[in-house]
């Protein structure tokens, strides 16, 4: 019976010593929880920023005239995915195409300028439905002239 009492006392002492360490463990867990919360906040703050579209990235690199003609081209190509395909081309080729559009539209003056611009828009639509941007300046030409008709 004495042995059982001694073992029981040793067991209680051992159990008591484990509880004293648990207080430190609880403090550490609380600190870890706080630091984990801070880490989660920094991750949440970083995620709301959504990536920019190809069009937005391109617009940052264009002049005001080029942006205007990009809008014109977007309207001309419509929602058939041709505009998205256009945005996939090299930036220098896109700028060259936009400058070509500007020069062709600037030629459209006079009484029939709106009709000439509409015809050029149809020409551009037809070109991008099957053409490659490399030949754009040669194949997408307006019937406009400087004098108008």
Swiss-Prot record:
Residues 1-17 form the signal peptide. It is a lipid-anchor. Residues 38-58 have a biased composition (Basic and acidic residues). It is found in: Cell outer membrane. Its main location: membrane. A lipid is attached at residue 18 (S-diacylglycerol cysteine). It holds the Pfam family Mlp. Keywords: Cell outer membrane, Lipoprotein, Membrane, Palmitate, Plasmid, Signal. A lipid is attached at residue 18 (N-palmitoyl cysteine). Residues 26-58 are annotated as: Disordered. Induction: Strongly induced when grown at 35 degrees Celsius. GO terms for cellular component: cell outer membrane. Belongs to the Multicopy lipoprotein (Mlp) family. An outer membrane protein that may participate in pathogenesis. Some human Lyme disease patients have antibodies against this protein. The Mlp proteins probably undergo intragenic recombination, generating new alleles. This is Lipoprotein MlpF.
